């Protein structure tokens, strides 16, 4: 491997502020912030959405009735196709 061309890969803490969840994972992201977890200092990145807060993963997503919109379409434009 060539020296000096690869990004600095290190353990980083990502904080999902909407769910107040911390993720400790490897990353090459650059940040000036740090946080202390379990006696060790880590680079710290704030994120707004993660799997802990995204509606798709939490099951709090809205489901729209497809039958209602289809029926409404046929009610408005059904006569044009006959």
Curated annotation (Swiss-Prot):
<dbReference type="Pfam" id="PF01197">
    <property type="entry name" value="Ribosomal_L31"/>
</dbReference>
<dbReference type="InterPro" id="IPR034704">
    <property type="entry name" value="Ribosomal_bL28/bL31-like_sf"/>
</dbReference>
<dbReference type="InterPro" id="IPR027493">
    <property type="entry name" value="Ribosomal_bL31_B"/>
</dbReference>
<protein>
    <recommendedName>
        <fullName>Large ribosomal subunit protein bL31B</fullName>
    </recommendedName>
</protein>
<keyword id="KW-0687">Ribonucleoprotein</keyword>
<keyword id="KW-0689">Ribosomal protein</keyword>
<dbReference type="GO" id="GO:1990904">
    <property type="term" value="C:ribonucleoprotein complex"/>
</dbReference>
<comment type="subunit">
    <text>Part of the 50S ribosomal subunit.</text>
</comment>
<dbReference type="InterPro" id="IPR042105">
    <property type="entry name" value="Ribosomal_bL31_sf"/>
</dbReference>
<dbReference type="GO" id="GO:0006412">
    <property type="term" value="P:translation"/>
</dbReference>
<dbReference type="GO" id="GO:0005840">
    <property type="term" value="C:ribosome"/>
</dbReference>
<dbReference type="InterPro" id="IPR002150">
    <property type="entry name" value="Ribosomal_bL31"/>
</dbReference>
<dbReference type="GO" id="GO:0003735">
    <property type="term" value="F:structural constituent of ribosome"/>
</dbReference>
<comment type="similarity">
    <text>Belongs to the bacterial ribosomal protein bL31 family. Type B subfamily.</text>
</comment>
């Amino acid at each position: 491997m060539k020296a000096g061309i690869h990004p600095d890969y290190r353990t980083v803490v990502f904080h999902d502020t909407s769910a107040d969840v911390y993720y400790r994972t490897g990353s090459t992201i650059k940040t000036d912030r740090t946080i202390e977890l379990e006696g060790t200092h880590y680079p710290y990145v704030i994120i707004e959405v993660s799997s802990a807060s995204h509606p798709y993963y939490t099951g709090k997503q809205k489901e729209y009735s497809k039958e209602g919109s289809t029926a409404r379409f046929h009610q408005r434009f059904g006569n044009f196709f006959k």
